[in-house]
């Protein structure tokens, strides 16, 4: 009999233990995630950074009530138009109508802080030209910045709940979230969705506690200065005219007498001649007058083909770059041109940001003087992404794709410009 009782007790204890274990598996943990562990350790004066739905390795700096964001974060996530002039230690910012500048200091207080070779921009300075929301917190110090407000995938919380570090009820809690809160949806799962809050938490929420995915356009009050464009009322049919000497201008009539369907001619008149940004010119006012009489617009072409200059050297040096811009506009106005066509080819990746700054600055001068600005580009490929045609399209009047050279001297035999290749180039632009 005692043996039977003992056995029954053992069975009972086992059943109770199993039940407790089973119940515990179903009870969500209420443990909170350590936020210092989550965001990472900061040195004195540093703050963790969240940009959109990403926790970043880079740190912000805090000085008193002011927050400073690393320039590479600003350029990479928020606004690429803050241009660092390293030689003169200042930030240039081109609006559609003016070029502004802010000198860097090795101390906080101003808009640009140069600390141990890293450039930081004051958050308020970034907000002056950029549509962002920022959330600043202590313990631990962190800054969350939201910058995407259109066509955002979202879910809405159906009742008060929590966001956890990982998917699963045993994962620690990151933060509470209230009914009707709109969360940014990162990934949909079977039972848990990965979401981000506007104030910088990135974690998981039970799928049954949020709505179906939706697309949200946030209402915004920020108004950026808009670019205006000089465009023609009809499609541009452009022909380049190779001019290698001033004497060649005298043959304009002969060259164009049988030309039909063209409304813009672009003579190859200008070339960057040295590393100071000086320009050699073959421009002719008489040529322009004859073209106008034939109903043609004239966009003078400038190239970077001279062996006596380095495109990187010219465009990365603000004095040389702006000398180039000034000379181009001066020559264009003197000859009575309607526009400038930039044909800078074989650009290396390291010159990409300087080329874009050149276009921004030249755009200001061209539009001040009623000149159309157009830019020639190779057909889009992965290795030419630094041309950044999307940014070009925002600051110039016409982005031109050179839809040829599919095959060339030294390549495999084939079409110069097959129709599918040209069509793909247009689609990819």
List PLM regions with ranges:
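Primary recognition of N-terminal secretory signal peptides and signal-anchoring hydrophobic helices
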Residues: 1-189, 219-231
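Hydrophobic faces of well-ordered beta-strands that scaffold small-molecule active sites
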Residues: 237-241, 263-267, 298-302, 340-342, ...
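Surface-exposed, active-site-proximal loop segments in enzymatic domains
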Residues: 274-280, 306-320, 410-414
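Substrate-binding cleft of extracellular glycoside hydrolase catalytic domains
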Residues: 289-340, 344-345, 367-368
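Boundary/entry segment of secreted carbohydrate-active catalytic domains
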Residues: 160, 201, 206-253
């Amino acid at each position: 009999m005692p043996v039977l009782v003992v056995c029954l007790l053992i069975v009972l204890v086992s059943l109770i233990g199993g039940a407790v274990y089973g119940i515990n598996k179903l009870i969500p943990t209420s443990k909170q995630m350590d936020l210092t562990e989550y965001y990472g350790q900061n040195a004195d004066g540093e703050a963790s950074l969240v940009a959109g739905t990403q926790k970043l390795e880079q740190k912000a700096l805090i000085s008193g009530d002011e927050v400073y964001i690393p320039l590479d974060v600003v350029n990479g996530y928020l606004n690429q138009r803050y241009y660092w002039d390293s030689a003169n230690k200042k930030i240039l910012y081109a609006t559609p109508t003016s070029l502004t500048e802010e000198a860097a200091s090795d101390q906080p207080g101003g808009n640009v802080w140069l600390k141990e070779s890293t450039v930081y921009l004051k958050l308020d300075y970034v907000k002056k030209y950029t549509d962002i929301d920022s959330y600043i917190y202590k313990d631990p110090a962190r800054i969350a910045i939201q910058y995407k407000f259109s066509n955002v995938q979202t879910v809405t919380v159906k009742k008060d709940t929590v966001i956890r570090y990982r998917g699963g009820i045993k994962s620690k809690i990151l933060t509470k979230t209230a009914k009707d809160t709109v969360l940014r949806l990162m990934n949909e799962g079977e039972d848990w969705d990965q979401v981000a809050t506007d104030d910088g938490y990135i974690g998981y929420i039970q799928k049954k506690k949020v709505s179906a995915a939706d697309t949200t356009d946030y209402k915004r009050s920020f108004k950026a200065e808009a670019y205006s464009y000089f465009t023609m009322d009809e499609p541009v049919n452009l022909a380049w005219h190779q001019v290698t000497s001033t004497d060649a201008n005298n043959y304009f009539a002969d060259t164009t007498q049988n030309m039909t369907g063209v409304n813009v001619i672009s003579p190859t008149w200008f070339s960057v001649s040295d590393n100071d940004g000086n320009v050699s010119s073959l421009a002719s006012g008489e040529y322009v007058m004859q073209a106008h009489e034939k109903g043609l617009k004239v966009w003078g072409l400038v190239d970077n083909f001279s062996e006596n200059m380095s495109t990187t050297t010219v465009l990365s040096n603000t004095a040389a770059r702006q000398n180039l811009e000034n000379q181009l506009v001066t020559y264009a106005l003197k000859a009575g041109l309607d526009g400038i066509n930039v044909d800078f080819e074989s650009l290396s990746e390291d010159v990409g940001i300087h080329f874009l700054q050149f276009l921004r600055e030249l755009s200001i001068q061209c539009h001040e003087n009623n000149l159309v600005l157009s830019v020639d580009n190779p057909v889009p490929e992965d290795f030419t992404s630094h041309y950044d045609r999307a940014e070009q399209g925002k600051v110039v009047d016409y982005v031109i794709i050179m839809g040829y050279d599919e095959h060339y001297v030294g390549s495999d035999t084939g079409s110069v410009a097959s129709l599918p290749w040209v069509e793909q180039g247009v689609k990819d632009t």
